[in-house]
Amino acid sequence: MAKLVSKIYGDALFETAVEEHRVDDFFEETEGILRVLEENEELSRLMSHPQVVKEEKMQLIENIFKGKVSDEIVGLLELLVEKDHFGKTKDVLVYFRDEVKEYKKIGTVHVTSAMELSKEQKEQVEKKLLETTNYVSFEMHYEVDTALIGGMVIRMGDRVVD
């Protein structure tokens, strides 16, 4: 159910962003909201608490976000409250972020190696990935796992290269 909710609302937000030529604006705004929600656990708990009435939650959204983010984003947050899905807000915004990255052909790659890679090795990995995929850039995440005997494991979405 959570995936369905995040997909429905995330797709609607993405379509609106594309239609209005505001993909970058919406992306920045949703990233900001994600930061606010992650830094303020009490806000998330309050917004999901069943004893706080919807009107109070709506007023809270207005007070916090109105004038700081677009009316479309405020409307989305209010709709999530209205439909009792505010607890899925992070999922919706992460889904939207992933859709934007795919739209802009920005891949996310997790590289795990047996030892720390040099700057040159990291550049070589990224260059090879750019040559062999349809992406124009990557968000690269590197991690060392001493349990690996040698080499590296590259994860990109649901693909794994060993």
Place the predicted regions along the sequence by residue.
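Elongated, mostly alpha-helical coiled-coil "stalk/stator" tethers of large membrane protein machines
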Residues: M1-V161
